[in-house]
């Protein structure tokens, strides 16, 4: 084990995965290689991917324990209170983001998220988790983060939901924004963001974006069906062609 306040990192053996364990008094007066007292373990963080596990271990060695505790509290809230299913990588990405956000705040650097409006509109549930996160940062660390940071947290949550990279998540968000604008302008209508139809449309766009940016597009084997739709809804079909060309 390696001491770091109330936290330590343990390597079981060459075949076992690396884990981070947290608990009061863990690592106190301990020596490298010493067996950990199981009764002191309050939480075990285990990342199955070896690369992510190593990155996570190095990250928590240099950060205050409070950052990891805070990250765990936010993730637990998203899972248990909201019911989100998140990839294990969220422990690494969220803890790292919280660290940088607090560092920016302490340096007096204002962060402006260019996708804040889109995140609030297209990912309201995840944005709610982001607002919970900045509230907890304020309560626990007396650090006042803005809604732009809440939007960034939300993007990390979305990334963990769909198991895509942050860059892909941002690309998907931009795609949704642009397609919504194309539909609104081409059909000369104002989309009702509170409607069930709008929610379904956004959901379809999310999965479309995910397939596009992960290279998992579906085949186009039914041209007959497309012709039927074009005949029944010529204006809407023309709009979809404009989107396809985009």
Predicted regions and their residues:
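SH3/SH3-like beta-barrel fold
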Residues: 10-13, 21
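A short macromolecule-binding patch
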Residues: 17-30
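General marker for long, soluble alpha-helical cores
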Residues: 68-80, 104, 108, 120, ...
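Small-residue-rich helix-loop
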Residues: 172-189, 194-212, 217-232
């Amino acid at each position: 084990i390696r001491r770091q306040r109330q936290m330590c990192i343990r390597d079981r053996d060459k075949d076992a995965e690396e884990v981070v364990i947290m608990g009061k008094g863990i690592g106190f007066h301990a020596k490298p290689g010493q067996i950990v007292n199981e009764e002191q373990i309050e939480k075990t963080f285990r990342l199955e991917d070896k690369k992510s596990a190593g990155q996570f271990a190095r990250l928590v060695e240099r950060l205050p324990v409070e950052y990891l505790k805070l990250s765990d509290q936010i993730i637990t809230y998203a899972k248990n209170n909201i019911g989100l299913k998140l990839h294990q990588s969220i422990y690494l990405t969220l803890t790292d983001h919280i660290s940088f956000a607090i560092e920016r705040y302490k340096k007096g650097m204002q962060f402006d998220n260019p996708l804040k409006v889109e995140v609030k509109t297209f990912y309201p549930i995840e944005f709610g988790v982001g607002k919970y996160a900045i509230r907890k940062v304020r309560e626990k660390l007396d650090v006042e983060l803005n809604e732009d940071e809440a939007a960034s947290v939300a993007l990390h949550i979305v990334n963990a939901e769909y198991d895509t990279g942050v860059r892909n998540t941002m690309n998907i968000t931009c795609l949704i924004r642009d397609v919504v604008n194309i539909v609104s302008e081409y059909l000369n209508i104002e989309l009702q963001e509170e409607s069930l139809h709008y929610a379904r449309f956004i959901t379809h766009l999310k999965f479309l974006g995910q397939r596009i940016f992960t290279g998992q597009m579906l085949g186009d084997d039914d041209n007959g069906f497309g012709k039927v739709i074009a005949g029944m809804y010529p204006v809407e079909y023309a709009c979809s062609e404009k989107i396809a060309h985009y």
